[in-house]
Amino acid sequence: YGRLSAVITKARRTAGKGSYQLEAADLAREDHLHECLLLYVPEPSLPRSVLARQAEWVQERFSGRAWLAAELFCEGEDWGWLGRLQDLAGSTGFPLVAAGNVHMHARSRRALQDVLTATRLKCAVAEAGFALFANGERHLRSLQALKSLYPPALLEQTLQIAARCHFSLDELRYEYPDEVVPPRYTPRSYLRNVTYQGMDARW
C-alpha cells in the first residue's frame, strides 16, 4: 500500500490539479509495485501493432501479475472489441479478465455522473458532448448481467485476482517519520504540543 501510494503521489505531482501522469519508467522501477497486481486497459482506437507492443512491455515487467482488461459497455462494438482482445491475449500470452470501469453504484445515478463530468470540464452538461458516457452501463452490475456479457473464463479470472488480494484497510496505521518526533515525545503528545504552540502564535 505504501509503494502504491508513493506512485500515486508521484503521478499527481507531475500533472496539473485533478490529473495524473506516469511515465513508463515510473512503472518499470524495480522497487515500485512489486507486490501489486496490474490491469492493462487497452485503448480501442489504437492500432493492433501498438496494443501488442504495449501488452508485451507490460508482460515483461509484470509477468504473472498482470491481466488484459476487457471492458464491455453495450455500446455496439462490444463483440468486435472482445474479439480483438482475445486475439491480442492469444498472441501475447496475456490472461484476459472481465473489468467494469465502474463510475457509479447504480444506473440511476447516470445524471449525476454527467453533471460531475461537465463540472470537471467546466461546461454545461449540454455542451459536454462525447465526453459523457454513451449509456449508464458503468455501474455495479449483477453477476447475472455479467454472465450475459462475458465469457465464463474472463469471469473466472476475476476470482483468481481476488484470491491473490490479501490487503485489508485494517492493516493501515499512520507512521510518523522518526525524525519528526523528538525523543521525549510520543507522536500524539508531540502533535498536541505543536498544535498548542500554533494556537498561541495565532490567537
Question: Where are the language model's segments positioned?
Answer:
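Conserved active-site carboxylates
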Residues: Y1-L72, R107-W203
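Short acidic/histidine-rich active-site segments
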Residues: F94-S108
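Surface-exposed, charge/polar-rich loops and edge strands
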Residues: G90
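Active-site glycine- and acidic-residue-rich loops that bind
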Residues: C74-G83
